[in-house]
Amino acid sequence: MKRTYQPHNKRRKRTHGFLVRMRTKGGRKVLKRRRLKGRKRLAV
């Protein structure tokens, strides 16, 4: 059986990247929360 996680950097950036997060209100909320939490990396 094939494993479910088949990593691809292009897909990773396109779905979880910083620019994608900035595009929607919800994504911006994600970044805001991660900033408040003090995450070293806000997005992929």
Swiss-Prot record:
Keywords: Ribonucleoprotein, Ribosomal protein. GO terms for cellular component: ribonucleoprotein complex; ribosome. One of its GO terms (biological process) is translation. Belongs to the bacterial ribosomal protein bL34 family. PROSITE patterns: RIBOSOMAL_L34 (PS00784). The keyword Ribonucleoprotein applies. It comes from Caldicellulosiruptor bescii (strain ATCC BAA-1888 / DSM 6725 / KCTC 15123 / Z-1320). The gene is rpmH. This is Large ribosomal subunit protein bL34. It holds the Pfam family Ribosomal_L34. One of its GO terms (molecular function) is structural constituent of ribosome. Residues 25-44 are annotated as: Disordered.
